[in-house]
């Protein structure tokens, strides 16, 4: 699955392609959209060096079918006091799900065939995208858009 920069970049690419009306709903809540781009991956950063209930929840969410989250998210968006804020987060999460779902089969196949770890593939993919975009992977803060 892609890592931080790939999700950030994909979300930015998607945002500019959305219809103007939808983009205008998201833009005031861009930090929520940006947070949604990382889906449950954000839970992996909580006490990252040890297993705990938060990162286990992140792993469990990755194992569930997307409909579990999206059914709940639809209810939240429909009942939220600020529908556009909830929508911004949910649409960011949709981007996360779409990119993971597309890339995951390739990553898993490459992992099986090469012996390279899932994390190594994610890291190198992010590094390739960073270099392609003119950034130094060693110095670029990939999570600078998350507030």
Question: How would you name each of these model-derived features?
Answer:
Residues 1-88, 106-145:
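N-terminal, motif-rich segments that launch catalysis or mediate targeting to/interaction with membranes
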Residues 89, 93:
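Short alpha-helical catalytic segment bearing the HExxH-like zincin motif
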